[in-house]
Amino acid sequence: MKTLLETCNKFFDELKIISGPHQCDNSNDKICLEKAINTFLKSGQKEDAFVVYLCFCEIFNVFGQGYTNTKKLLEMLSDHEYHSGELLAKHRDHYSHSVYVFALGLAIYAHDGAFRKAFSDFYGYGNSNVNSYYFLKYWGLVSLFHDIGYPFELAHAQIRTYCEEIWGKDDKNLYISFGNLNNFISLDSDVSKRLRKTFPQGNSFGTINKLLSYGLNVRLGYEQEAVEHKLEDRVLSQKNFMDHAYFSAVLLAKKLFSVADFEMSMQYLDVLTAILLHNSFNKYEAPDRRPIAVSEHPLSYLLILCDELQSWDRLAYGKISKRDPIAWDIRLDIADKSIKIKYIFDSFINKEYNEDNLSVKIVYNKNYLEMIEGEFVAKILGTDYILDNPSIKSSLNNQKYYEGYIVPNLDLTLEVAEEKKEKKVSLITSDKSFFNLYDLAKLIHVSYNEYCKGLEGSRVDEDFGKLPLEYKISNIDTAKSYSDKLARIDCFYSSKDLDYPVVTDINKLIYSSYKDNREFLCREEHVRWVKEKLSLGWKYGTDYVSVEERNRKKIHKCIVPYELLPDEEKSKDALMIEGIFTQLLKLENNVKIYNYPMGHKPKIEIAGVGHRFFIDDTDSIKQEIKRWLQKYIETNQVVVRTCFAYGADQLIAECAFDLGLTVKADIPLDYESYIKDVREDAIRSGYRFTDSDELRMRHLLAQTAVCKTIIDPVHKYEAASKYIVDKCDVLIAIWDGKAVELFNENKKPINRGGTYDSIRLAREANKTVHVIECRRN
């Protein structure tokens, strides 16, 4: 079984169209969106979910130009439930949840050929690339915006919860209904006329309700007037429940109609009705209601399925929700008409939770498997599906009968497992709200603009909104990094008034007499920039004469270690660091920078050595390397050192980068000479060292925090080997177990700079040594 990230990547691997059916490939936008989704799936953080929303809105421009036209709509959802959700008994995050739903749908589309065919047959776009493009567009709208109406349900639920806390459940309790609904959902005459032209077979379209009921009539055959009546009744007369799905559909419709040149189509109407149906509409007591088949409404079918299955890594706000355990990750196996999901729970839960104190919704372990295989599956696919599938071991709790949300045309298998979750401990972090990040990114762009005006050959677009998506994200990534950079010098920022010392002069920290924080942070900024460029498909290269040619080829001469940068380029990193303080203070929501010694983990340096050439599978060796590194990460601030020779050294560095660790390079020659020497050594040893191998080595070295040359012209390799052993606390060695030694006339071993010599030196110095066995030719 695979992770959602691995499963989702297939969609982008096969996608050839990203910016429209008449452009066969816009690789930058495609890579930006894929990178944003991958980053979010690795972190689960809201600020990374925000970048997914931004990429989608920038690519498709469904609300007008770019992200700014829908900024408030999305960010207010997150802000509102953050501040209001704690007043409820049960409530979990919907902002990041929607991005998970988006990614899960992409994974199902990529791996389930039956669903792809159903979508293609339903919409008939022609070739697979065009189908994938339009699926991405309309599925993105459905999934990312399906919960934007949740604040309406929150307001209703808060009053209900308040009354029940005081008087208990009582028919005499107050409940909220929303006034002025007819004006809120009304459509002006021009919009109504355009809708009549688009849907000539429909009745008048004076309200959004009429439009929604028409869409349900066309796709599912629901009687239009009956649906209109139920929509109004559920909003104005509902005591126990307010359907956020209805308000999500209404808000999205209003937003679409606010765009000057927007033209409604049946596809957009399918988006709206899919959102309307996803929560509880098929439970309305309306004529002709029934489970939805994929052939009737593919977008609705998929949203209901993914929305129900997304039951992991959801931040809890409500009192009971905070107490309920929830899976922190999943593993997937998707094929034609088959989905197998394993929900992974933190292994500590059984020890720390008492079953008797948990809510009825989820009782962990022995009962949870029964719940998801029984009630959970039955709610999606119906009780008949459970009864017809003896492979599902458990029966329904209390023998409840569920009609099901969707027609069961797939095999759905759900499991649970335990796996220890690695904790990221942080005492206090900066308040990285979405308002901060987007506005901060614009300030960074303005600052960079002002600086570059004085540089020959520099051209930067004055308007942030007109920047290519790649450069907008670059500024946002810089803004996101401010939190980590401040933490490195014992600071954080927040818009709250807190009882910590306020920093009034950041330069006193940056230019500290006891520590060169400026140089350190500049190095960190360069490494961040290098990793960003590499993740977007850029490479090291010098074969260009203009910025336009450089950007077209996606090559850059500055993808090198910080030490090799010209002073002009180093000054750009310094600009970012020195601008942190002034840019944060320019934000409108009263941001302050506070000083707080955070009690860092003890620092430990791990050296990596090993053979240049071995015949074992590198994946298994990488797993072992990461296992040892992760052991030390739990309790230490880990720095990895290596000489970056071909083979094991570079493999260890690669693993360290994968884990987000700081890496230092200690090389025996100057940079260019060493790369040449590594290539020649490989050729002498009978191994092909290709241009791709050299480029990979350059890219690895460019990500190092320090690239230091150990100067010893006579014993260069021996000196470098001894240097990293002397500096390290722990040695990880990829070794074949053979002690190859040479002795001098006094019968003392000679340091040849080889793997065994490093192991021997470390053991003689009583340093911890971890050996990972390998085989050599």
Segments predicted by a language model, with ranges:
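Active-site-adjacent bridging/hinge elements
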Residues: 67-82, 214-228, 452-461, 549-559
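Acidic/glycine-enriched connector segments
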Residues: 598-776
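Phosphate/oxyanion-binding active-site loops and adjacent basic polyanion-contact surfaces
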Residues: 90-109, 240-248, 471-474, 569-576, ...
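Divalent metal-dependent catalytic cores for phosphoryl transfer on phosphate-bearing substrates
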Residues: 128-331
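C-terminal effector/catalytic modules and regulatory tails appended to multi-domain proteins
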Residues: 1-75, 291-296, 300, 306-309, ...
